[in-house]
Amino acid sequence: MCLIKWFKEMRKRRRDRIYEGPYEDGGVIVNDDPQAKKSVESRDLISFYLKYSTLAFLEEDTNLKSGVYCLGACLEKDGSAVSCTVDCSDGIDVGSVRKEMRSIEFLSRVDEILKKYDVASRNGYYHNVQGLPDFYGVKVDASYSSGESIYCFDNQEAFLPIELLRELCTLFDVKNITPKDYGV
């Protein structure tokens, strides 16, 4: 079986275990997957995605522009480079996407930041308030070559520390940008 297909099937089985509950507006689904590992042994991160909203924070408190930060990194099929994506928007205007290639050491640095802030301890956490707009909360989705993964989601509040976002913004070379800085 293809490795990518195996990852997709594993994620689907995992998400099927944690997506339960009411789907009407205002309905709240809170779940913590008991089978999700709360630590990751592997150091070989192969894909990473973070969506972090700072719309509920004051810019003075975060030292970041208020907005939604979407940061992604994925190891290329040949394993020679990492494809990175940065998309920042202010919740009203749509941001533009910046894509670039990085060295494979880039994913190791992302993994170090994830371990520093113990993101794996939130693995399997899912909190969804139906009817809220898409631009609130935090989502993390990370996959490792060993088959281990981290997935956590909350569309109501930012449950991970703002310092995590600051360090990732530094690594992804995001400099307090808004869509207007991208020429939008």
Description of each model-found segment:
Residues 74-81, 145-146:
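Short, solvent-exposed coil/turn segments at beta-strand boundaries
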